[in-house]
């Protein structure tokens, strides 16, 4: 077998040619490097022992699932498709995504000072365009067409570009934010406190949302805002296939989980109304 560093470099090139996103490449190479350093061999039996080792060290099924994806890609890279097929991911229970109510989104926006245009825009883009946090941070000025009200999300999950229409209100917010900036950064959102205006980091987005969420009394994450976008669209009667395209889901089944959220929303509304109970009580 080649030296681990040499193998990892070749594996990175393979993943790039496969069209994997930079985030996926980083994740896969991290786990494969750990596997090789652990002394893993090129077979599913060795990989299963590695997974058992990780489980003993506290890895959840969800985390192990990511490791399996990385190792299967690595085995295919080595031309061992049969070994890749033998390596099955552990079952991960699919929990319903948690969405904020519209009132909670309003509360969140209300605690952001008017002078913090960037912070307000972060919330509006995650909720109003359904972006992933990595997509938000990677947006460049050239990806936004304010006149036509469009955002081009480049290299989303699966390294696929998609076009997301935005309402005039959101386009105006973007324009106001850009007019308040004097830097020459190519990125739509930048770090505020640094002299050199680098692109905004995902970690800072999480931090900002946590801080504003505490002020508003709302538990919020970037994913929750994206989930809220999808759930509220569905509640307004938007076709699920349109929501699939807006979210950038390759499979409709991934989007269909939101129908369960909406059914629960309807069930609660029905239980609150108590129509039958009131009828039978009369």
Curated annotation (Swiss-Prot):
Entry annotated with the keyword Membrane: no
Compartments, record wording: Cytoplasm
Molecular-function GO terms, alphabetical: DNA binding; site-specific recombinase activity; tyrosine-based site-specific recombinase activity
UniProt record, GO biological process: chromosome segregation; DNA recombination; DNA transposition
SUPFAM superfamilies found in the cross-reference section: DNA breaking-rejoining enzymes
Lineage: superkingdom: Archaea
Database matches in InterPro entries: CB (IPR044068), DNA_brk_join_enz (IPR011010), Integrase-like_cat_sf (IPR013762), Integrase_catalytic (IPR002104), Integrase_recombinase_N (IPR010998), Integrase_SAM-like_N (IPR004107), Tyrosine_recombinase_XerCD (IPR050090), XerA (IPR033686)
Domain Core-binding (CB): 2-79
Keyword terms: Cytoplasm, DNA integration, DNA recombination, DNA-binding
Active site per database record: 132, 157, 223, 226, 249, 258
CDD domains from the UniProt entry: INT_XerDC_C (cd00798)
Main location per the UniProt record: cytoplasm
Tyr recombinase domain boundaries: 95-271
Record-level GO cellular component terms: cytoplasm
Gene3D superfamilies: 1.10.150.130, Intergrase catalytic core
Family classification: Belongs to the 'phage' integrase family. XerA subfamily.
The protein's role, per its UniProt record: Site-specific tyrosine recombinase, which acts by catalyzing the cutting and rejoining of the recombining DNA molecules.
The name this protein goes by in its record: Tyrosine recombinase XerA
Source organism: Thermococcus kodakarensis (strain ATCC BAA-918 / JCM 12380 / KOD1)
Gene that encodes it: xerA
